[in-house]
């Protein structure tokens, strides 16, 4: 039993990247796919409620944070607005920055704005 506890402790200390690498190694070693296991496990509940994954997102500026000038520059670059319009948008947060974008684009825009110091939500 102590060996199992040690394994649990070791796994709990892994970073997300290390856990993902471990999953890949185990998939290769055992010849299985983690995605297939999730699909099989989810199958009984799927009949109860089929939930579609969201495909369109709205990038919402929650707040500008401490670096308002940097956030205004990023908003201008993303939206193509003029300086005054971008400043008004940032100061009027929470406001949508871009609507109807796919998940990858939304994540990219969120990362850009957060790097500039903004707090961003995806809806």
Curated annotation (Swiss-Prot):
Keyword Chloroplast applies: no
GO molecular function: mRNA binding; structural constituent of ribosome
Biological process, per Gene Ontology: translation
Keyword Ribonucleoprotein set for record: yes
InterPro entries: Ribosomal_bL12 (IPR000206), Ribosomal_bL12_C (IPR013823), Ribosomal_bL12_C/ClpS-like (IPR014719), Ribosomal_bL12_oligo (IPR008932), Ribosomal_bL12_oligo_N_sf (IPR036235)
Gene3D superfamilies associated with the record: 3.30.1390.10, Single helix bin (1.20.5.710)
Pfam family of the protein (one): Ribosomal_L12_N
Primary role: Forms part of the ribosomal stalk which helps the ribosome interact with GTP-bound translation factors. Is thus essential for accurate translation.
Subunit structure: Homodimer. Part of the ribosomal stalk of the 50S ribosomal subunit. Forms a multimeric L10(L12)X complex, where L10 forms an elongated spine to which 2 to 4 L12 dimers bind in a sequential fashion. Binds GTP-bound translation factors.
Protein name, entry field: Large ribosomal subunit protein bL12
Species of the source: Rhodopseudomonas palustris (strain BisB5)
Gene (name only): rplL
């Amino acid at each position: 039993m102590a060996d199992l506890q040690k394994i649990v402790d070791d796994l709990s200390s892994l970073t997300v990247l290390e856990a993902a690498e471990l999953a890949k190694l185990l998939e290769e070693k055992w010849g299985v796919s983690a995605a297939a296991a999730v699909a099989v496990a989810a199958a009984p509940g799927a009949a109860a409620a089929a939930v579609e994954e969201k495909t369109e997102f709205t990038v919402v500026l929650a707040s500008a944070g401490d670096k308002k000038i940097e956030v205004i520059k990023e908003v201008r670059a993303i939206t193509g607005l003029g300086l005054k319009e971008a400043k008004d948008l940032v100061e009027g947060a929470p406001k949508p920055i871009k609507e109807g974008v796919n998940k990858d684009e939304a994540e990219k825009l969120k990362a850009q704005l957060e790097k500039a110091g903004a707090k961003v939500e995806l809806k």
